[in-house]
């Protein structure tokens, strides 16, 4: 996530050795959570090695064929179903993930200038395989033996996940480029075919003009569609692998995590697909208020649907109550797919931000001289995720405020 953990060290003077908190640490019964081994089997989950490599896509193919090819290459048959689910969910699962714009800022296939985009297919590319299981250089830290080590441990977990995600994303960006070029070649071939047999003076120029229009009207929309599938797979795969290993290590030390005090300063940190602490058995607060059992059950329902380990909170879970509960859905609230799309759009816009260009064509017949070369990503991103915001409202593109992590002293 794009945040650093703030640290709270609650000394004896600060907490005045609260009897309630002391009782939490002393009376925590780790047997309530059962046997860790029977719960998850081992540190390696069924998601750990689902995808080894992905080949380059077909040299030229229609976007529809490329979409199906990407599903097969990723072994992601659940992808379309999950994207449909995101249409009926309101939670923000993704905006706390790092955007890593620097990976895209020089990717010319994302240029807003159609001439730049077309120039990327002027030379033949080498066929290559993409390793989609690249690991980061930072190992998953072990839980501390004493509560005093919890703040540093949580920060190390956060850093380890960020490094792992970035390493994997670098491979995914290369795969995205090859798919973009396949779309360009398809549009190029389509434009050339439309001029065959026409009695015109310069068929090549006519074909090029039509290709430019296709880039503006269709290319960016098709790229966004592929990117939604690709980055949903990236985020889920990395988060699943990392989280199940994390859950295995944290579940073995419930007594240490019973002394944890953790605050999600923003709700989107709580609804996020990645959590640095999955065994949050101490005092947990959401936006400064005690976390409710129903809120925990609802977010765990989404996590179960996504194949992620549940967040366990020993002080919040209710006896003999289910661990999950389906949240309600409102058509008037932002949708999960909108948050994902907005997040991906920040990546796709990175080239244009670094290489700003003056618009070359404007509508002369319109009083506002509207630019006609705006990229068309398809559905209105803003309409999917945003109501008219107040000045204080947190938007998906805003960097998250740091959550706070501390420990209870004996």
UniProtKB/Swiss-Prot annotation:
Keywords: DNA-binding, Host nucleus, Phosphoprotein, Transcription, Transcription regulation, Virion, Virion tegument. GO terms for molecular function: DNA binding. InterPro entries: Alpha_TIF, Alpha_TIF_sf. Gene3D superfamilies: Alpha trans-inducing (Alpha-TIF) (1.10.1290.10). Its main location: virion. Transcriptional activator of immediate-early (IE) gene products (alpha genes). Acts as a key activator of lytic infection by initiating the lytic program through the assembly of the transcriptional regulatory VP16-induced complex composed of VP16 and two cellular factors, HCFC1 and POU2F 1. VP16-induced complex represents a regulatory switch: when it is on, it promotes IE-gene expression and thus lytic infection, and when it is off, it limits IE-gene transcription favoring latent infection. Belongs to the herpesviridae tegument protein VP16 protein family. This is Tegument protein VP16 homolog.
